[in-house]
């Protein structure tokens, strides 16, 4: 709701996404400076490994923000609620994992609920829906590949991994946001 309120006053979702990422990066820099969080040991290998994860993070973040700018927050969240469905499908494809029959059955209420809510939506926007779907896809791909990396780079905790992803994501997003919204 805060994103939507902000976008009503400042209708620049790409720049808002950039400001949000920059805020997180500044916060983590403060945490590292004050030694409240250990500074991660960063190498070229980890930066190159995190680059695709950060790209998916960027896509997920900015797509959600653009979706909020195009339609009701409630409908964006209805679409985002389908993320577990995306997660099961993409985890099966990329991680070669199989799930129990109960996992698939548990997705049925999600699909039914999202479908029912979508049918009742008054402020429908195909653009907003597409951005929300792209956000789901980006979030799930980020999570799938992050999971792989957490197993590979065990010396970096989840907080620092997320911070590094956010820094790279900010590097991706800032110039694009500037070009799109100035």
Protein language model features and the residues they cover:
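Polytopic endomembrane small-metabolite transporters, centered on the Drug/Metabolite Transporter
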Residues: 1-182
């Amino acid at each position: 709701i805060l994103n939507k309120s902000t976008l009503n006053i400042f209708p620049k979702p790409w720049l808002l996404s950039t400001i949000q990422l920059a805020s997180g990066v500044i916060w983590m820099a403060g945490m590292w400076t004050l030694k409240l969080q250990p500074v991660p040991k960063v190498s070229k290998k980890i930066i190159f490994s995190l680059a695709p994860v950060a790209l998916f993070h960027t896509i997920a973040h900015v797509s959600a923000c653009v979706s909020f700018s195009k339609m009701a927050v409630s409908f964006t969240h209805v679409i985002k609620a389908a993320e577990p469905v995306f997660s099961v499908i993409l985890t099966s494809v990329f991680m070669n994992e199989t799930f129990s029959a109960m996992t698939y059955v548990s997705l049925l209420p999600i699909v039914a609920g999202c479908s029912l809510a979508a049918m009742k939506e008054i402020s429908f926007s195909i653009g907003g829906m597409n951005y929300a779907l792209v956000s789901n896809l980006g979030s799930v791909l980020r999570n799938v590949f992050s999971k792989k990396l957490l197993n590979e780079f065990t010396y970096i905790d989840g907080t620092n991994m997320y911070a590094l992803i956010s820094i790279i994501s900010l590097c991706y997003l800032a110039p694009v946001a500037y070009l799109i919204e100035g």
